[in-house]
């Protein structure tokens, strides 16, 4: 099927990249927003377009505000995903406070809420990754800054190794190799670090709004696929007067089968997702951004 126009997508990305300001400051006043067109009926999603989440790469986070679920991406950041799994299996994150909650992100991950790191060694930064043909990448289209698309639920930007915008590759030819980086959209999960980019250890944060100024600076390891409303509901503060906390953090594969959330995610390679994407682009017009796209999840 023909690819949707990326003119609007590029405009949104160019504006965000040029601003380089905290995400909360980028939201225009409601009075300046253009009128929203009437929403079209969502396309019917056939059963075969849904796929079960991978229990080995799904993190279930219970908090004082409720539960959210994160799709982890070892193909983007293998060391950081391995660290999350190891600390979750140790019970390290259980009881960790959301001690720094700002408009754009919620930070947690300090077991003692005072030591700022686990006993494990710091990790080298994995803010960029190598796209290979083995990684199932869905291209939305070429931008002057790279090729935008999805790896599962994770929005990414690819600098093609060959072809692509820099060398005149047509927009409908998706790259299969090159350097990639995660886009810090709402729901992106990443590791915090100190002055050195190679000092990530146990501190993690979850994006509440878009944060382009964080891209390629911090290692993203996953994206919230269910429960982003929980992340948004966490009490603000640095620290909050009465912080929320993670009560229990588990890799889904480690949970008893009866206790696991029964979730299916829409396959981004499916025609159903392509139809949803085109509908979103048509509805938003020049205001469209890849961060507007929420990957549908089916429970039960």
Predicted regions and their residues:
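Positively charged n-region of N-terminal signal peptides that target proteins for export
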Residues: 1-4
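Bacterial N-terminal signal peptides
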Residues: 7-16
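Cyclophilin-like peptidyl-prolyl cis-trans isomerases
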Residues: 20-300
């Amino acid at each position: 099927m023909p690819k949707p126009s990326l003119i609007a997508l590029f405009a949104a990305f160019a504006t965000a990249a040029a601003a380089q300001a905290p995400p909360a400051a980028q939201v225009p006043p409601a009075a300046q927003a253009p009128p929203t067109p009437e929403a079209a009926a969502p396309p019917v999603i056939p059963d075969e377009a849904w796929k079960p989440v991978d229990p080995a790469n799904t993190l279930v986070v219970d908090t004082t505000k409720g539960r959210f679920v994160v799709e982890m991406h070892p193909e983007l950041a293998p060391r950081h995903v391995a660290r999350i799994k190891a600390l979750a299996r140790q019970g390290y994150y259980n009881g960790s406070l959301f001690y720094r909650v700002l408009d754009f992100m919620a930070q947690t991950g300090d077991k003692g809420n005072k030591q700022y790191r686990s006993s494990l060694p710091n990790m080298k930064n994995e803010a960029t990754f190598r796209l290979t043909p083995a990684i199932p990448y869905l291209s939305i289209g070429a931008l002057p800054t790279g090729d935008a698309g999805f790896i599962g639920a994770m929005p990414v930007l690819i600098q093609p190794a060959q072809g692509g915008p820099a060398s005149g590759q047509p927009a409908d030819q998706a790259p299969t190799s090159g350097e990639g980086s995660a886009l810090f959209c709402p729901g992106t999960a990443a590791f915090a670090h100190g002055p050195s980019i190679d000092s990530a250890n146990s501190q993690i944060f979850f994006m509440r709004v878009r944060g382009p100024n964080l891209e390629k600076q911090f290692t993203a390891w996953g994206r919230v696929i269910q429960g982003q409303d929980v992340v948004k509901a966490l009490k603000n503060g640095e620290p909050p007067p009465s912080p929320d906390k993670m009560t229990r953090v588990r890799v889904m594969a480690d949970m008893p089968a009866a206790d696991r959330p029964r979730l299916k995610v829409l396959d981004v390679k499916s025609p159903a997702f392509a139809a949803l994407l085109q509908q979103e682009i048509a509805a938003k017009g020049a205001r469209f951004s890849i961060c507007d796209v929420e990957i549908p999840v089916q429970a039960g």
